[in-house]
């Protein structure tokens, strides 16, 4: 198994990043996701929230225009869930489009972002104010 740092390095090498780019970008992303002190650990040595941060870091390390987070808080406690959503918000503020797929209405309602609700494959609401009303089903 690879360490967190090795995982990120592998993701960058896979797309042809130079060693110089890797040396610059990996520490930046580790710091951004709050794992700068845990880069030498293996994912199985980390908590669930930290493992989720590794997944986000791996998605982010090659500086994509967009990341899709499918149920990023699925198995996390409420505090870790909020931390992950705040991290995704920070990533969005830095210029990356973030699409979050979730059933966690209470988490979504804490952020003033666009909310698109889909039911049976159809858009049933598109709210720019970022709030689910009580009638909205997900």
Language-model segments: what does each one mean?
Residues 63:
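Conserved catalytic motifs of ABC-family nucleotide-binding domains
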Residues 82-94:
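Helical segment within the ABC ATPase nucleotide-binding domain
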């Amino acid at each position: 198994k690879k360490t967190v740092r090795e995982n990120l390095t592998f993701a960058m090498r896979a797309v042809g990043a130079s060693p110089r780019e890797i040396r610059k970008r990996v520490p930046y992303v580790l710091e951004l996701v709050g794992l700068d002190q845990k880069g030498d650990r293996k994912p199985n040595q980390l908590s669930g929230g930290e493992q989720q941060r590794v997944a986000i870091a791996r998605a982010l390390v090659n500086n994509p225009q967009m990341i899709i987070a499918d149920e990023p808080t699925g198995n996390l406690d409420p505090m870790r869930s909020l931390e992950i959503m705040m991290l995704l918000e920070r990533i969005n503020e830095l210029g990356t489009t973030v699409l979050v797929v979730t059933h966690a209405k209470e988490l979504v309602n804490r952020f003033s972002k666009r909310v698109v609700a889909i039911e049976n494959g159809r858009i049933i609401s598109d709210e720019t104010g970022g709030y689910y009303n009580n009638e909205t089903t997900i």
